């Protein structure tokens, strides 16, 4: 059996992913990195991008959209604290664009300041998803 690393991803939206993987490819503020088993410890800021995980050495890479966050690499563990993540095959760009248009329309018609802030936050999240999606 191949030597594997535990990947843990956590977001403020209570999204969690925990699985054993062979490699994780990430885009940090310093450039792209690939984390393999027994990688030296490191901590870095990650940017909005499409990351890739490989479950086994010869397995195909699986694309995963990650938004801003921090990665901590330890001997047998990669921990990612990200604003948002989703596997690329689960993302429906048409639905995101439709939702974005609806949110912008709702914002233009909203008078309550608290609801405006919530709408702006959702708009920013969806715009970030679209930008990161183009990174693939």
Swiss-Prot record:
Function of the molecule: Produces ATP from ADP in the presence of a proton gradient across the membrane.
Listed NCBIfam families: ATP_synt_epsi
Protein name: ATP synthase epsilon chain
Alphabetical list of InterPro entries matching this protein: ATP_synth_F1_dsu/esu, ATP_synth_F1_dsu/esu_N, ATPsynth_dsu/esu_N
A Pfam entry, by short name: ATP-synt_DE_N
Gene name of the record: atpC
Disulfide bond entries: none
Organism of provenance: Ureaplasma urealyticum serovar 10 (strain ATCC 33699 / Western)
Membrane topology, from the record: Peripheral membrane protein
Primary location group: membrane
Subunit note: F-type ATPases have 2 components, CF(1) - the catalytic core - and CF(0) - the membrane proton channel. CF(1) has five subunits: alpha(3), beta(3), gamma(1), delta(1), epsilon(1). CF(0) has three main subunits: a, b and c.
């Amino acid at each position: 059996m191949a030597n594997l690393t535990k990947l843990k991803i956590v977001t403020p939206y209570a999204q969690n992913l925990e699985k054993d993987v062979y490699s994780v490819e990430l885009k940090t503020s310093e450039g792209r990195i690939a984390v393999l088993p027994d990688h030296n410890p490191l901590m870095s800021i990650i940017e909005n991008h499409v990351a890739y995980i490989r479950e086994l050495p010869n397995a195909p890479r699986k694309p995963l959209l990650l938004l801003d966050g921090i990665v901590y690499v330890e001997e047998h563990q990669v921990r990612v604290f990200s604003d948002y993540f989703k596997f690329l095959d689960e993302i429906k760009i048409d639905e995101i664009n439709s939702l974005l248009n609806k949110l912008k329309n709702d914002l233009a018609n909203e008078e309550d300041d608290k609801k405006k802030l919530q709408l702006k936050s959702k708009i920013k999240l969806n715009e970030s998803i679209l930008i990161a999606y183009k990174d693939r």
